């Protein structure tokens, strides 16, 4: 419709990557992809890796790293006057988060598709929340997008990786489990929003 077209035209895209400071992370592919689709791109350089791994020396650094990354991003968004951010969380991320919440927190929670964060003045949207990780991976391959290699020292041995492997095992032994968890998780989430 014309109204939808007008809304779409008013949206401006601006891509930002938070560089946490791990050696060997190369964002050149991200920059080139953004240039190819005419989207401005900026890399926010931080010392988060140093803070998390040298200053704090936490055995499970993911939570602190995530908080610091988000803080750096929200700060930059505020400086730019941007009030929305789209995260690339996919269906598998949603399911893994629900499983992690159940295992480690004793509650059934996962992130909603849209969240307003009043302290940051930012609305978080997750446009790929219903897309399986394999669908995202196939798109990336088909488009020839260069993936940034994660050089975090704990990559592959995190609570999220454990939840991912556990969910894969459960789904192998009980085919369709992933597809059944998503709507239940989302329904539960919606029931607790009100």
Q: What are these language model-derived features?
A:
Residues 1-98, 104-107, 134-142:
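ATP-dependent adenylation/nucleotidyltransferase module used to activate substrates
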Residues 8, 187-188:
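Low-complexity, disordered terminal segments
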Residues 11, 94-172:
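Catalytic subdomain that performs nucleotidyl-dependent activation
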Residues 20, 154, 185:
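Glycine-rich beta-alpha junction loops
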Residues 29, 72, 165-166, 180:
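Alpha-helical elements of Rossmann-like donor-binding domains used by nucleotide-donor carbohydrate transfer enzymes
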Residues 68, 131, 176:
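Conserved active-site and cofactor/substrate-binding residues in soluble primary-metabolism enzymes
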Residues 166-185:
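An accessory alpha-helical subdomain
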Residues 191-194:
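A short, hydrophobic C-terminal helix/tail in secreted or cell-surface proteins
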